[in-house]
Regions:
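Non-catalytic protein-protein interaction segments used by genome-maintenance enzymes to assemble
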Residues: 47, 120-180
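Short beta-strand or tight-loop elements
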Residues: 112-118, 129-133, 232
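C-terminal RecA-like lobe
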Residues: 1-67, 143
Length: 267
């Protein structure tokens, strides 16, 4: 392994078995059914909806944030996703407005030189780690990274979700800034369902060794070929192995290696 995206590392940490299914075995999720009836009929897949929101926010002027008019938004999104429904468009518009009308957006608008969708790359243990940042501000000594989330909170606290599901991503974002010369890196998560409940963590140069150690441990496990299912609603959603070679949440007390043996047998 010589190159990994932060999303690949995060996927491995979330469920190494799903990582194997997607990144090693080459399994692909089943196509999203748009004709299943009920409320989901014709609806965008959650990842498509999230992509539309992120692409629209990338077009927003961060120094004077304003959501596009409804007709303009609909025309743009239909160009990307012709199957989008009116309900989808309404949800997308609400998410974009949630950022533009938030206190965080006002704070970001005052940061000179703030830019959307910035690439990054750095090396750890001979592996190039790369990815993109939704929003980056860097003035030399200080840096701020903003990551938008369109996840459904389902009553959960945003800080709890970040701690449980985005630790690796947060560490990678902080390292990207600190490795680029910042002495302080603030990583901010904004769940657009609750735009004022931002989750902010600040890292300093003194944290670099700890962050690198955690990232190195993940890379070492990937290199070591440890692939075991760790089912959860978040990890299993959309997994191509689910109900094919893995029982997912139904695994219960199954031996840790049982699903791995089943997948290996398909090779």
């Amino acid at each position: 392994v010589t190159r990994l995206s932060y999303s690949a590392i995060a996927l491995y940490d979330r469920c190494s078995y799903r990582f194997y299914a997607e990144r090693v075995a080459g399994m692909r999720p089943a196509p999203w059914r748009r004709d299943g009836g009920g409320e989901a009929a014709g609806a965008l897949h959650p990842t498509e909806l999230g992509d539309a929101v992120h692409r629209l926010l990338e077009r927003v002027d961060l120094t004077a944030p304003a959501a596009p008019p409804g007709e303009e938004l609909a025309q743009v999104v239909r160009g990307w996703y012709p199957a989008v429904t009116d309900d989808d468009l309404s949800r997308i518009g609400v998410f974009v407005e949630a950022y533009c009308d938030s206190e965080l957006a006002r704070r970001v608008s005052a940061l000179p030189g703030v830019r959307p969708e910035r690439p990054f790359a750095f090396e750890v243990d001979g592996v190039l780690v790369n990815g993109r940042l939704d929003v980056l501000w860097h003035d030399g000594e200080r840096a701020l990274v903003l990551d938008y989330k369109t996840n459904a909170l389902l009553g959960r606290d945003p800080a709890e979700i970040v701690d449980e599901e985005y630790q690796t991503q947060r560490a990678v974002y902080a390292l990207a800034c600190l490795r680029a010369g910042a002495t302080e890196a603030e990583v901010v998560y904004q769940f657009l369902e609750a735009p004022e409940a931002v989750v902010t963590t600040t890292f300093a140069v003194a944290d670099v060794a700890r962050l690198e150690e955690a990232l190195s441990a993940s890379i070492a496990r990937i290199r070591g070929g440890e692939f075991r299912p760790t089912p959860s609603p978040f990890a299993c959603s959309g997994c191509p192995a689910l109900d094919v070679v893995c029982a997912g949440p139904r695994l219960g007390g199954s031996p840790p290696g049982a699903a791995a043996l089943e997948l290996a047998a398909l090779g």
